[in-house]
Each structure stands twice: as structure tokens, then as C-alpha cells.
């Protein structure tokens, strides 16, 4: 592309949602980006608001990470390729950009990369802007029939896929999912696909328990501090084979997860507590001989996620309860912060 044409394209305006500080989002004008070698320009289609986005918006940090300000949030997204022979192709976008060279990448764990860049985190701008450039290697073309909204939710589905792989759910197992937000509901769907015979789900919000049943939970319980006792009673004192904690509520769900697990069980912690700390009874975990694993984002999940949705084995559409345009960003973030519905989507 000629330098002058590049200059003209870069001068074309776009809207970009900049996060400056707690409760301070501003929709501003910006220049469209120009792709570097190995990258391609994308026109953003749909962006899901994640729990970590809300932690940033309400508290200024998440998972012990603070941001460089201003920053564009948004890491659950789909987009249309905006240049080249594939212009107009809808793609899912992996927000994680590992280095590919470090010890952990070489071991097959790019989610643990020491040099990882992640959309909408640290100093890497995310997708809440009309255009962005991204490495071609992180794009996954979506088949006909896929909606942009579904494409955006392949990222949280990937988190659920990774978590259930860590848990190693087998047919006939009894599983618990503590926290029935989007990640919890997708974990329920994945546990059901893996053949779990009984799935207990908990949440503090009654409406989310209804969604848990719709997504495959056989038993739903309010997260009132007594759920562990009820689960033990329902399983004749045996407890759960595999437990997934997806609430991120600073300890209560983690403690209940530990107390609900059978001897020798695996407990997978997915949720991110707002205070970056959690507690549970060490003696309860030790007496049970539990294996406790932390789920760090996801790895190698996009092809599987696309296949599962394409085959109708995973339902993403039912999780989308609110949709907004970019100009109504304030309402979108406030709705998500109030935990109304399940998944809030911003369509660009």
C-alpha cells in the first residue's frame, strides 16, 4: 500500500471507548489503525462484557492487575476482516497473544506465557472500538450461520472448556458448579456433554438458578451458606466427584466447594475474587485429600468451541440477555455491574 494511501486511511475517524479510571468511560474519536506485517485490520462486530471488565470498571483492577490509563477494554469479541481478499469474513478473535518462545509456551501452556499480551488488559487495547488490528494467527473464521454475538462468546466458552478439561469430568460423575453466571452456565453445559449424571448448581440470584436448570443442572440451590450441607444430604454424605467454583465471591463459594467435595475429589477454581484473595478450611481440604486446581483463562479451545456450537451441542444464544450499541455503553456497563441477566453484549 502506498504511504500516502496509508496516511489517508489512518486519518479516517472511528469511535473508541476509553477507560480512564473507576466509573470513568469516555467515547472518543480516534484514528483508524494501520495493520503491521503479520496483522490485519478488523471491524469490530460484537463484544461481551466480562466479569473482569466490571472489576476494572468498578474497582480499578482484577486478579491483582492494574491497567495503564487510558485503555480500551473488551476481550470477548468477534469482528469482520476489513482488508485483503477475505474482507467481510466474520471471525472469532483470540484475545491472548503469547510469545511462543518462553518455557511455558514451549510446554504447550500459552495461557501461562510470561510475555503474554491480552486484549483489554495491562497496556494492550481491547475491542470496544470500531476498528483494530490483530495478528492473523489469532483469528478463527466462523462458518455460515454463526452470529457475531455467538462469535464473541467463544472466549468464555473456551474458559469453560479449559476448566472442564482440568476437572476431567467422566460419564456418571456427580458435579457441582458454584456460581451460575455465564462461565458457570457454560461449565454446566460442558459437564453435561462430558456425561455427568447429576449436576448441582448454586447462585445467590434466583433468576440465575432458573438459567442453570435451562442449561442442564439437575439440582439448583441458593448460595446461602447452607448449600454444602444440602448437597451432602442429597448424595447420602458422599459429596461431589468434581467441583467448579465460578462465583469469585471472596471465599464463600470456595469454602462451600471444599465442603461439598467427596474424598479424593478435584476442585477447580475459576472465579476471580474482587479482593484478590480467598480462604477455605485447610483441614477440610486436607482430610478429604482434595486436588485443587486454578483455571488460568484457556488454551487451544477455539476450534473445539466453534465445532460444539456449529453442531448444536452448546447453546450460546440463550445466555445473551441484554444487547446495546456502543453509544449506550454506560447503560451496558451499569446493567452488567448490577448483575442483571447473564451476558451483556455491545454490538458495533
Model-derived features with residue positions:
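Mid-domain Rossmann-like dinucleotide-binding core that forms the NAD(H)/NADP(H) cofactor-binding site
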Residues: 88, 144-225
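Cytochrome P450 core scaffold surrounding the K-helix E-X-X-R motif
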Residues: 52-58
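C-terminal hydrophobic helical "lid"/dimerization subdomain
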Residues: 4-16, 255-259, 299-348
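Glycine-rich beta-strand-centered segment in the early N-terminal region that forms part
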Residues: 33-47, 61-103, 143-145
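Glycine-rich cofactor phosphate-binding loops and adjacent beta1-alpha1 units
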Residues: 167, 210, 215-291
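Residues in the short beta-alpha loop(s) of Rossmann-like NAD(P)-binding domains
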Residues: 205, 273, 298
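NAD(P)H dinucleotide-binding glycine-rich loop of Rossmann-like/cofactor-binding domains
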Residues: 99-178
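Receiver (REC) domain switch-region micro-motif
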Residues: 91, 175, 241-243
Amino acid at each position: 500500500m502506498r504511504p500516502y494511501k496509508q496516511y489517508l486511511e489512518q486519518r479516517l475517524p472511528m469511535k473508541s471507548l476509553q477507560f480512564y479510571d473507576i466509573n470513568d468511560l469516555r467515547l472518543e474519536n480516534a484514528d483508524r489503525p494501520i495493520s503491521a506485517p503479520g496483522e490485519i485490520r478488523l471491524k469490530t462486530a460484537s463484544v461481551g462484557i466480562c466479569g473482569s471488565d466490571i472489576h476494572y470498571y468498578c474497582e480499578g483492577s482484577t486478579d491483582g492487575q492494574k491497567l495503564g490509563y487510558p485503555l480500551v477494554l473488551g476481550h470477548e469479541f468477534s469482528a469482520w476482516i476489513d482488508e485483503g481478499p477475505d474482507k467481510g469474513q466474520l471471525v472469532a478473535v483470540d484475545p491472548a497473544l503469547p510469545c511462543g518462545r518462553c518455557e511455558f509456551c514451549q510446554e504447550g501452556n500459552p495461557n501461562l506465557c510470561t510475555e503474554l499480551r491480552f486484549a483489554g488488559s495491562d497496556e494492550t487495547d481491547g475491542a470496544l472500538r470500531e476498528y483494530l488490528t490483530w495478528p492473523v494467527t489469532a483469528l478463527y473464521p466462523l462458518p455460515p450461520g454463526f452470529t457475531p454475538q455467538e462469535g464473541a462468546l467463544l472466549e468464555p466458552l473456551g474458559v469453560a472448556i479449559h476448566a472442564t478439561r482440568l476437572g476431567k469430568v467422566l460419564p456418571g460423575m456427580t458435579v457441582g458448579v458454584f456460581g451460575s453466571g455465564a462461565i458457570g452456565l457454560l461449565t454446566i453445559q460442558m459437564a453435561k456433554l462430558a456425561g455427568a449424571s447429576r449436576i448441582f448448581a448454586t447462585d445467590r440470584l434466583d433468576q440465575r438458578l432458573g438459567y442453570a436448570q435451562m442449561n442442564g443442572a439437575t439440582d439448583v440451590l441458593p448460595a446461602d451458606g447452607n448449600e454444602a450441607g444440602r448437597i451432602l444430604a442429597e448424595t447420602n454424605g458422599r459429596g461431589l466427584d468434581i467441583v467448579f467454583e465460578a462465583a469469585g465471591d471472596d471465599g464463600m463459594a470456595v469454602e462451600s466447594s471444599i465442603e461439598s467435595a467427596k474424598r479424593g475429589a478435584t476442585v477447580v477454581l475459576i472465579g476471580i475474587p474482587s479482593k484478590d484473595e480467598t480462604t477455605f478450611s485447610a483441614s477440610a481440604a486436607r482430610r478429604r485429600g482434595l486436588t485443587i486446581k486454578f483455571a488460568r483463562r484457556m488454551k487451544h479451545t477455539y476450534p473445539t468451541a466453534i465445532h460444539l456450537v456449529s453442531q448444536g451441542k452448546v447453546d450460546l444464544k440463550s445466555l445473551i440477555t441484554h444487547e446495546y450499541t456502543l453509544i449506550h455503553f454506560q447503560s451496558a456497563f451499569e446493567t452488567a455491574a448490577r448483575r442483571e441477566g447473564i451476558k451483556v453484549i455491545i454490538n458495533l
